[in-house]
Swiss-Prot record:
It is an enzyme of class 3 (hydrolase). Its cofactor is Mg(2+). This is Ribonuclease VapC40. GO terms for molecular function: magnesium ion binding; RNA nuclease activity. It comes from Mycobacterium tuberculosis (strain ATCC 25618 / H37Rv). Pfam families: PIN. Keywords: Hydrolase, Magnesium, Metal-binding, Nuclease, Toxin-antitoxin system. Belongs to the PINc/VapC protein family. The lineage of its organism: Bacteria, Bacillati, Actinomycetota, Actinomycetes, Mycobacteriales.
Length: 134
């Protein structure tokens, strides 16, 4: 099972993005969406500066077209475990959300697809299986 993070999802939608073609190839391999990454992608694409801002209905359709599977998400007990891991691995600030995405992929047994070199450090600290999409 493979799951993209927000960096792959945004690049997969944005034809003007330098990583668009690689992201589309990755997404066409059959992916599962992580709930947080789906919501974050919606947020990013609907708030880009003009002329790149996307209408909410278009982002919704894009996310729906990627997969018909249920989103991957942590259960309540796993959120408690996540905060334990955050403290144990000294994950702070915005990297906390990278950890949420990575921890969700790991809990689901999915390899995480990313274009975000900065997030790779967090993913690796949590021992998440990662594939860089280039």
């Amino acid at each position: 099972m493979i799951a993209p993070d927000t960096s792959v999802l945004v690049a997969g939608f944005a034809t003007w993005h330098e990583g668009h073609e690689a992201a589309v190839r990755a997404l066409n391999r059959g992916v599962h969406l992580i709930a947080h990454a789906a919501v974050e992608t919606y947020s990013v694409l609907t708030r880009l500066p003009p002329p790149h801002r996307i209408a909410p209905v278009a982002v919704h359709a894009y996310l729906a077209d990627i997969t018909s599977s249920n989103y991957l998400a942590l259960d309540a007990c796993s959120y408690r475990g996540l905060t334990d891991h955050l403290a144990e691995h000294d994950v702070t600030g915005g990297a906390t959300y990278d950890a949420l995405v990575g921890f969700t992929a790991k809990a689901a047994g999915a390899k995480l697809l990313t274009r975000d070199l900065r997030a790779v450090e967090t993913y690796e600290r949590l021992r998440v299986e990662v594939e860089l999409v280039t």
